């Protein structure tokens, strides 16, 4: 931005923050896919996303986990499907100290995603980030379907988990 405006980059960023009253977001791309895979294979790694909703979010807000399965499991074979699912669900829950989520067992919360492993993939781009992933048939949160036959049907069965 600074280069485009002929300003010092820090000055341009501060001017933008003032002009937009701090309502500024940033989408950053860095690193190589080779490095992503190297970290992904580490035993202590969990899958997550730190994207925020609203405005024009990072494409992974709508497709981080579908990308994990479609790109890194199916296409690149960096992980097995079982290992990826474990890192996305139970391992992540255990890391956060949440024992009643991330796996299916009596007394646990019934959060389930039913997908076609041969079709699941993220579709969001930096230009159009708010696209739902392909290949997801059902999403069931606390026993209620919020995606049915691939279509978002709404609902607010999820809850904020206090750590």
Model-derived features: where do they sit?
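His/Asp/Glu-enriched, well-ordered alpha-helical/loop segment
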Residues: 1-19, 31-117
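Short catalytic-site patches enriched in acidic/histidine residues
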Residues: 21-29
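Short Gly/Pro-enriched turn/cap motifs at secondary-structure boundaries
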Residues: 27, 60, 129-131
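Residue-level detector of alpha-helical recognition elements and their boundaries
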Residues: 28, 99-100, 107, 122, ...
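Short beta-strand-to-coil "C-cap" segments at the C-terminal boundary of structured domains/repeats
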Residues: 162-163
